[in-house]
């Protein structure tokens, strides 16, 4: 207590026999009560040390002093003034209201003689501003002290500001007690954030902010207007980087409307940042301090699980949230009573805020009692579920609880007595597990009864070994004995009406006695390469064509065979085409013979060449012609010479007609000039040429190159050359050697080599 007085700047007052003098000296205001019994019960609340004598024994006890001081049904609406103005204590309550003559601040305690039980409390300890007819700012205006009376310390302006905006102080408890004793009474008794009991003042008495209490307690601010189109998350975080308590921010877009959401560690930091931006002259943002959704805030504060009904649970989370340890809730059996009582008023707000959620919540009926009876029952009848009286409350319910929650006490076949509650444990009928397979039928028959359930999680009596409780370990059913004959041994006879036992009977009579053990495949050292073929998808299935369908298609039927007459006609047509081509070729050759002095042959002479480096270009140009055989390029003096040999004379004639005047280089004017060679390539005698020309005129142009060689051979025979038919090369070489020994001219032997060319290896 001495530390509390040191925090408030008050000297420790001496002990006094009169409790009223103590209250006046300590600065505790006491309101006027209407009943004498309540004053007498309050007389035993405090002793000389200023602490509480007795803790609350039970919630429903009429002699409990806390029931008189902290009545749940008379909780006033919390003031919208930010709780950051409270310099004393940890509870976000109101500041002490000064008395009429400020005697407790000046150290002079004036009180009438009399005792506390006779309701003789000094009027100096009561603020006259609370003598109005209403506590919500409606009705007659309150009476405030004259303006010439001032407080003697620095808290005067704050206390006066606290008294002016709203008159929501509790009638039964002075704010001084709330500010001076934060550790003696649980903090949830001081929490008066439930605004549903008393509506807000219709005159709008909040002078600091027009936001609601939930908005001021929110750690999230939203910028709903004034955001430029090119405003991104990086620029948004740059605005709040140096703000105290800033966590993170983001920009969201809903239906084309962009808004920014900024998260802070607490509501004070969010309020400071909001006020700082509003005070800026360059600020064009529309800022509100409000949660996006209560469930998002639950996810933001780590440690608080998300809830499905925000209206029912958001208020109790804010009331039971521990400000000393951010991010962790503070639930206990001591404050569970206040949470339950506030749910009654939360449902009324939920019907207006979330009508669809309320209808969905009402449609969920886990019990068999009428739905209206459950919803109309007061939550306070559930009691204070402290660990010391949980079992007593459940085993001895009230009349309403017995009618609604329908506790059932049954005995199973083994004579074990258990208690069930379908509301607290909706899955109780499935929580009983059999010990072995033989008892499956027994457990099913027990669970099929309408009013027979297993043991609940609130019953801690270990009389049922298979019951599942919150602190008990989950026990699996014992495994039945298994033998080599693939049969299970049970103590009772198998019931064929039970599907489980029928399956066991079929398994026992199955011809398969033992199945081979399944061994896992080991992965080889080279990885999954051997299984690559198995991992490939199967090829696409293509159906085989039906032979009957294929044969029935007219396009695939066998074509008729050609007749002999048709073949003869085709052969005659081909011969006529060849004769026509030969006639055309003969006319071309005759015209060339008339213009050219040399007789036509299969060798073409290429003239008008000035550059000796044109051999590659000539080979590339003539190699594309049909019947090309070889090219001979020679240089005599300064002028190059080129001969091109073809397989047949007709090919040479076509090539000469096509390539006549072709320009291989820009330096040569007129292009190349083509003419028949005097001698075929390799033939040097002029006599042979005359003989070949005479044969050509007699028999017509040859069709193949072999005809040219046959003409040369016949000319040689006329000159009485010696011919021998020799197939192997050595025999031909020996014959040539023998011929050289004879009296023949060397020119004649060279002609033989030109006619008979031996293949080289």
From Swiss-Prot:
Keyword annotations from UniProtKB, A to Z: mRNA processing, mRNA splicing, Repeat, RNA-binding
InterPro entries (alphabetical): Nucleotide-bd_a/b_plait_sf, RBD_domain_sf, RRM_dom
Biased composition (Low complexity): 199-211
GO cellular component, one term: cytoplasm
UniProt-listed SUPFAM superfamilies: RNA-binding domain, RBD
Biased composition (Basic and acidic residues): 188-197
Entries under PROSITE patterns matching the protein: RRM (PS50102)
Additional detail: Transcription is induced by mei4 transcription factor.
GO terms, biological process: mRNA processing; regulation of mRNA catabolic process; RNA splicing
Name this protein carries in UniProt: RNA-binding protein mde7
Biological source species: Schizosaccharomyces pombe (strain 972 / ATCC 24843)
Polar residues composition bias: residue spans: 31-46, 58-83, 99-110, 442-466
One Pfam family recorded for the sequence: RRM_1
Keyword hit for Nucleotide-binding: no
Domain RRM: 223-289, 602-679
């Amino acid at each position: 207590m001495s530390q509390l007085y040191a925090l408030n700047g008050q000297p420790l007052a001496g002990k006094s026999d009169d409790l009223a003098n103590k209250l006046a000296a300590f600065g505790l205001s006491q309101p006027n009560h209407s009943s004498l019994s309540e004053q007498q019960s309050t007389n035993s609340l405090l002793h000389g040390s200023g602490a509480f004598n007795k803790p609350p024994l039970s919630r429903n006890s009429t002699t409990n002093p806390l029931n008189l001081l902290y009545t749940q049904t008379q909780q006033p609406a919390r003031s919208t003034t930010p709780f950051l103005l409270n310099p004393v204590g940890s509870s976000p309550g109101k500041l002490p209201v000064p008395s009429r003559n400020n005697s407790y601040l000046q150290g002079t305690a004036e009180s009438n003689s009399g005792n506390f039980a006779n309701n003789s409390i000094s009027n100096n300890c009561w603020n006259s501003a609370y003598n109005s007819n209403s506590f919500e700012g409606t009705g007659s205006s309150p009476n405030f002290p004259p303006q010439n009376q001032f407080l003697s310390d620095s808290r005067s302006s704050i206390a006066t500001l606290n008294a002016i905006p709203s008159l929501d102080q509790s009638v039964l408890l002075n704010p001084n007690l709330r500010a001076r004793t934060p550790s003696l009474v649980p903090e949830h008794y001081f929490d008066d954030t439930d605004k549903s009991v008393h509506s807000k003042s219709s005159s709008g008495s909040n002078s600091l902010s027009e936001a609601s209490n939930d908005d001021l307690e929110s750690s999230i601010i939203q910028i709903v207007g004034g955001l430029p189109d090119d405003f991104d998350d990086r620029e948004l975080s740059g605005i709040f980087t140096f703000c105290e308590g800033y966590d993170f921010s983001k920009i969201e877009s809903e239906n084309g409307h962009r808004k920014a959401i900024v998260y802070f560690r607490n509501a004070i930091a969010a309020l400071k940042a909001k006020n700082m931006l509003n005070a800026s002259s360059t600020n064009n943002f529309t800022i509100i301090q409000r949660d996006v959704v209560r469930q998002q805030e639950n996810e933001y504060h780590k440690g608080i699980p998300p809830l499905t009904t925000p209206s029912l649970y958001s208020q109790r989370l804010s009331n039971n949230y521990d400000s000393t340890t951010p991010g962790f809730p503070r639930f206990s059996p001591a404050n569970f009573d206040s949470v339950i009582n506030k749910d009654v008023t939360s449902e009324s707000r939920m019907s207006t805020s979330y009508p669809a959620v309320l209808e969905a919540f009402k449609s969920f009926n886990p019990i068999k009692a009428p739905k209206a009876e459950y919803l109309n029952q007061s939550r306070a009848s559930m009691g204070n579920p402290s660990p010391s009286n949980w079992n007593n409350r459940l085993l001895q319910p009230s009349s309403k609880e017995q009618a609604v929650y329908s506790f059932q006490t049954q005995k199973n076949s083994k004579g074990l007595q258990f208690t069930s509650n379908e509301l607290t444990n909706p899955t109780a009928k499935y929580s009983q597990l059999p010990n072995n397979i033989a008892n499956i039928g027994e457990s099913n028959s027990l669970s099929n009864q309408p009013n027979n359930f297993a043991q609940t999680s609130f019953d801690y009596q270990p009389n049922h070994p298979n019951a599942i409780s919150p602190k008990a370990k989950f026990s699996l059913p014992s495994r039945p004995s298994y033998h080599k004959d693939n049969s299970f041994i049970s103590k009772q006879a198998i019931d064929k009406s039970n599907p489980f036992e029928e399956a066991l009977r079929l398994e026992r009579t199955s011809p398969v006695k033992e199945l081979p053990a399944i061994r896992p495949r080991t992965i080889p050292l080279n990885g999954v390469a051997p299984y690559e073929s198995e991992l490939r998808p199967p090829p696409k299935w293509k159906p085989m064509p039906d032979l009957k369908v294929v044969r029935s298609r007219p396009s695939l039927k066998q074509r008729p065979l050609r007749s002999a007459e048709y073949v003869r006609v085709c052969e005659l047509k081909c011969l006529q085409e060849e004769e026509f081509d030969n006639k055309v070729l003969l006319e071309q050759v005759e015209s060339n013979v008339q213009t050219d002095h040399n007789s036509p042959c299969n060798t073409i002479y290429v003239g008008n060449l000035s550059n000796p480096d044109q051999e590659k270009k000539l080979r590339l140009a003539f190699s594309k012609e049909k019947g090309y055989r070889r090219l001979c390029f020679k240089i005599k003096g300064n002028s190059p010479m080129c001969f091109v040999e073809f397989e047949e004379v007709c090919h040479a004639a076509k090539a000469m007609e096509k390539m006549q005047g072709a320009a291989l280089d820009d330096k040569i004017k007129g292009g190349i000039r083509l003419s028949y060679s005097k001698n075929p390539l390799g033939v040097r005698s002029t006599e042979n040429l005359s003989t070949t020309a005479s044969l050509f005129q007699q028999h017509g142009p040859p069709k193949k190159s072999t005809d040219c060689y046959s003409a040369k051979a016949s000319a040689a025979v006329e000159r009485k050359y010696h011919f021998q038919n020799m197939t192997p090369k050595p025999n031909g070489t020996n014959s040539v050697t023998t011929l050289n020994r004879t009296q023949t001219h060397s020119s004649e032997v060279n002609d033989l080599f030109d006619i008979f060319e031996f293949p080289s290896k």
